[in-house]
């Protein structure tokens, strides 16, 4: 009884011309997601996913590495033009935006800050004492 060799078809990645880069920069990490114009996620990366641990995840260098990683994945989908949505006050925020603009073959069309701000909603948590 010889086993049959199972061959899988290679998954074809859809070609998307434009995309949106979501940069979520928290105090502890920087997460980047690339979507198509409809909002369907194509690829993502974060400082933690690249092996940075602890306080090193929130550094600008870790954010830069995460952007370079995710944009290399995004180029496989044929993305040439992107918009950027930035959220959060983290340390890797500015570096991540600059890195997206510096990547060859990617044109930044627009940039938007979508950080949620309360209009005096919920009471904030008590101040941290170190």
Swiss-Prot record:
UniProt-listed Gene3D superfamilies: Ribosomal protein S11
Gene Ontology MF terms: rRNA binding; structural constituent of ribosome
Keyword annotations of the record: Ribonucleoprotein, Ribosomal protein, RNA-binding, rRNA-binding
Statement: the UniProt record of this protein carries the keyword RNA-binding: yes
A cellular-component GO term for this protein: ribosome
Top-level taxon of origin: Bacteria
Subunit relationships: Part of the 30S ribosomal subunit. Interacts with proteins S7 and S18. Binds to IF-3.
HAMAP family: Ribosomal_uS11
NCBIfam families: PRK05309.1, uS11_bact
Role this protein plays: Located on the platform of the 30S subunit, it bridges several disparate RNA helices of the 16S rRNA. Forms part of the Shine-Dalgarno cleft in the 70S ribosome.
Full protein name: Small ribosomal subunit protein uS11
């Amino acid at each position: 009884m010889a086993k049959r060799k199972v061959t899988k078809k290679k998954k074809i990645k859809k070609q998307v011309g434009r995309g949106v880069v979501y940069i979520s920069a928290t105090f502890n990490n920087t997460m980047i997601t690339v979507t198509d114009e409809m909002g369907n996620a194509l690829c993502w990366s974060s400082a933690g996913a690249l092996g940075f641990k602890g306080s090193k995840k929130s550094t600008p260098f870790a954010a830069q590495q995460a952007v370079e990683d995710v944009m290399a994945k995004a180029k496989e989908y044929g993305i040439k033009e992107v918009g950027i949505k930035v959220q959060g006050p983290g340390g890797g925020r500015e570096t991540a935006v600059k890195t997206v603009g510096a990547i060859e073959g990617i044109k930044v069309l627009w940039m938007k800050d979508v950080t949620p701000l309360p209009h005096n909603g919920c009471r904030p948590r008590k101040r941290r004492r170190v």
